[in-house]
């Protein structure tokens, strides 16, 4: 077994001696999530119910997945019709294609309600 070198003769890579020290804290990268919105909707539906962080993570993944599917389908529809803009019509059609039966009807009515509320508030 070779002997361990002593700490005297070794040079360590690092900052130059004349460089000013920057002891500023690094900003943590923000992780975007639908968590607060999922929580608000859950409290509207079931005010006395809580949600674990693992369940919240699953719900967040679900919302991201559905969002990506709707966006991809709406994009495909716009491309088929030689349009360069995704409008509420493409999104509505994408929802009708992706979601089954009654769920699609409810999603379309809620979406229409949200768009109407947004346009009247402007």
UniProtKB/Swiss-Prot annotation:
Crosslink (Glycyl lysine isopeptide (Lys-Gly) (interchain with G-Cter in ubiquitin)) position: 117
Subcellular location: Nucleus; Chromosome
Signal peptide: none
Domain of life per record: Eukaryota
Any one GO cellular component localisation term in the record: nucleus
GO MF term (any one): DNA binding
Disulfide bond in keyword set: no
Known role: Core component of nucleosome. Nucleosomes wrap and compact DNA into chromatin, limiting DNA accessibility to the cellular machineries which require DNA as a template. Histones thereby play a central role in transcription regulation, DNA repair, DNA replication and chromosomal stability. DNA accessibility is regulated via a complex set of post-translational modifications of histones, also called histone code, and nucleosome remodeling.
Quaternary organization: The nucleosome is a histone octamer containing two molecules each of H2A, H2B, H3 and H4 assembled in one H3-H4 heterotetramer and two H2A-H2B heterodimers. The octamer wraps approximately 147 bp of DNA.
Protein's recorded name: Histone H2B
Organism encoding this protein: Patiria pectinifera (Starfish)
């Amino acid at each position: 077994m070779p002997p361990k070198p002593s700490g005297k003769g070794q040079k360590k890579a690092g900052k130059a001696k004349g460089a000013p020290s920057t002891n500023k804290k690094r900003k943590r990268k923000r992780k975007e999530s639908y968590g607060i919105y999922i929580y608000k909707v859950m409290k509207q539906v079931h005010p006395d119910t809580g949600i674990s962080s693992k369940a919240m993570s699953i719900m967040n993944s679900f919302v991201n997945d559905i969002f990506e599917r709707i966006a991809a389908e709406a994009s495909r529809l716009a491309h088929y019709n030689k349009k360069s803009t995704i409008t509420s019509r493409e999104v509505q059609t994408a929802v009708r294609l992706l979601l089954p039966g009654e769920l699609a009807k409810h999603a379309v009515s809620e979406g229409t309600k949200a768009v109407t509320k947004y346009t009247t508030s402007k």
